[in-house]
Amino acid sequence: MGASARLLRAVIMGAPGSGKGTVSSRITTHFELKHLSSGDLLRDNMLRGTEIGVLAKAFIDQGKLIPDDVMTRLALHELKNLTQYSWLLDGFPRTLPQAEALDRAYQIDTVINLNVPFEVIKQRLTARWIHPASGRVYNIEFNPPKTVGIDDLTGEPLIQREDDKPETVIKRLKAYEDQTKPVLEYYQKKGVLETFSGTETNKIWPYVYAFLQTKVPQRSQKASVTP
């Protein structure tokens, strides 16, 4: 597909609720690269009680943000195991010092930025309700429960996570914007930022797919499958 044989070093960025998880999952289904989520990595290290995991947990328990140097150590340590693969970083870098530290270790080829209007994200996130015992997620717009506020299988009440309440969502989006604006500007100046704008993941995805076809080999068993 005209994809270069050189390994791809990519980053995906997008606000909470931008569809970043869905797009990342589709990318790894269709293309030969490893997806590295800093959130998953953090949880794994905390569960295993590694040195970095214990350090990170101490900050989280105090309600503090994990410092840049701890996140950087975590990500770079894991990337050492992926030197033979193309990879897609998700959730790192989040700040300018993290981006600069990553640059000292690897040359980033492309940064995929999902640009979804905040109003759309707000509607998307505040429409989410969960059944706490099972973790089942409902979306009032896309997959509502049969009875408002009630889990389909157990008949138990659904709750809205604190994170999904409108006032919290607005704060999270503002915090994301403030934190990542310098990172996006940094990558823009380097000429590696590719922004994909839209309101629906299914409409953004074909453009991301077409873009990556020029960058990285497709998975052979998926090569004939339409995205």
From Swiss-Prot:
In terms of domain of life, where is this protein from?
A: Eukaryota
Q: What is its EC number?
A: 2.7.4.10
* Tissue-level expression: Highly expressed in heart, skeletal muscle and liver, moderately expressed in pancreas and kidney, and weakly expressed in placenta, brain and lung.
- The UniProt annotation puts the region (LID) at 127-164
Q: Which residues bind GTP?
A: G17, G19, K20, G21, T22, R128, Y138, N139, R161, R172, T201
The N6-acetyllysine modification is found at: K34, K64, K80, K174, K189, K203
**Carries keyword Transferase?**
yes
Recorded catalytic activity of this chain's protein: a ribonucleoside 5'-triphosphate + AMP = a ribonucleoside 5'-diphosphate + ADP; GTP + AMP = GDP + ADP; ITP + AMP = IDP + ADP
Write out the GO biological process terms.
ADP biosynthetic process; AMP metabolic process; blood coagulation; GTP metabolic process; ITP metabolic process; nucleoside triphosphate biosynthetic process; UTP metabolic process
Alphabetic keyword roster: Acetylation, GTP-binding, Kinase, Ligase, Mitochondrion, Nucleotide-binding, Phosphoprotein, Transferase
Residues recorded with modification Phosphoserine: S37
Q: Where is this region: NMP?
A: 37-66
State where AMP binds: S38, R43, K64, G91, R94, Q98
> According to its record, what is known about the domains?
Consists of three domains, a large central CORE domain and two small peripheral domains, NMPbind and LID, which undergo movements during catalysis. The LID domain closes over the site of phosphoryl transfer upon GTP binding. Assembling and dissambling the active center during each catalytic cycle provides an effective means to prevent GTP hydrolysis.
Q: What name does UniProt use for this protein? A: GTP:AMP phosphotransferase AK3, mitochondrial
Organism annotation: Homo sapiens
